[in-house]
Amino acid sequence: MTNIRKTHPLMKIVNSSFIDLPAPSNISSWWNFGSLLGICLIMQILTGLFLAMHYTSDTMTAFSSVTHICRDVNYGWLIRYLHANGASMFFICLFLHVGRGLYYGSYMYLETWNIGVLLLFAVMATAFMGYVLPWGQMSFWGATVITNLLSAIPYIGTNLVEWIWGGFSVDKATLTRFFAFHFILPFIVAALAGVHLLFLHETGSNNPSGLNSDTDKIPFHPYYTIKDILGALIMISMLSSLVLFSPDMLGDPDNYTPANPLNTPPHIKPEWYFLFAYAILRSIPNKLGGVLALVLSILILMIIPLLHTAKQRSMMFRPMSQCMFWILVADLLTLTWIGGQPVEYPFVVIGQLASVIYFLIILFIMPITSMIENQLLKW
């Protein structure tokens, strides 16, 4: 008799994705982040669902409803802070996951990579709209500043912004639609993640060496299931520590003040995970130029496969490229720091320099470095 998990139409899909899936025997802990992202998404959907049961998307009551969740709902404070800090955890895993893809050349799986970039955009949109919902000062002004950027689009810009706002300013209509979009997007993300996996399983996983691993595969279960559980436990313990000891460490104190359209906060800044893009946006004095740079800073990931000039896939055996990669990481950390600083000397200059270096490394320095390495290897 054949095992039911290999014959049942539903079990068969689960089996070929998580149980009998052939996986390279040498994939390191950097390959854990996919499963961690899945866990983050499930956790965000669940905590978000319970928050939505008590939240009201009305400008008059939104802030009070969040206060009510934290004060009066059983473990409401825990659900809220798990959701808020879960987003930070989500982005930490996302950035590490993308970084792994860049380092080991996983972007050569074109469909998987491009859907991944789409996923990144979708998660960023979700997080931005979620930040608006508590209707604190930073929520309101963040929404105003970021949506206003669309007015830089020639000809249709102003109409587009007013259409998104549902009026002539960020108001009740904006909050209601942002809540609707914030609720639906995670399910779209989940569907996209399914397609992401579908395309990944067409080719099989990459591995640290970047070489073909068909000759040496092991079943996903029990080897990588247990490895993923360990990763999940580490992540959950980190998240629990953050939520239970310093839940407001990554938040903005301004968001504990109810939204006031008549009072602009001295420093408007997004959550930490958007600061690098915000710094790139601010480093260009022209509005349209800034918006283009902002979008391109992430869209540039899509053309990375075209810029791959190396004869080897992974950076494992390419010390010069490794060096450039870590300079890029340091540059992104610098941009993140600058994004949170006021617009004044010397931060403006540092931001402009870091932005130029970011695009230079990706577009020119990395491909040239790879070509030099090819020459050195007489390849």
From Swiss-Prot:
GO biological process: mitochondrial electron transport, ubiquinol to cytochrome c
Binding of heme b b566, residues: H97, H196
Compartment(s): Mitochondrion inner membrane
One of the record's GO cellular component terms: respiratory chain complex III
Record's keyword terms, sorted: Electron transport, Heme, Iron, Membrane, Metal-binding, Mitochondrion, Mitochondrion inner membrane, Respiratory chain, Transmembrane, Transmembrane helix, Transport, Ubiquinone
Function description: Component of the ubiquinol-cytochrome c reductase complex (complex III or cytochrome b-c1 complex) that is part of the mitochondrial respiratory chain. The b-c1 complex mediates electron transfer from ubiquinol to cytochrome c. Contributes to the generation of a proton gradient across the mitochondrial membrane that is then used for ATP synthesis.
Subunit structure: The cytochrome bc1 complex contains 11 subunits: 3 respiratory subunits (MT-CYB, CYC1 and UQCRFS1), 2 core proteins (UQCRC1 and UQCRC2) and 6 low-molecular weight proteins (UQCRH/QCR6, UQCRB/QCR7, UQCRQ/QCR8, UQCR10/QCR9, UQCR11/QCR10 and a cleavage product of UQCRFS1). This cytochrome bc1 complex then forms a dimer.
Record's protein name: Cytochrome b
Organism: Crocidura sibirica
Lineage per the UniProt record: Eukaryota, Metazoa, Chordata, Craniata, Vertebrata
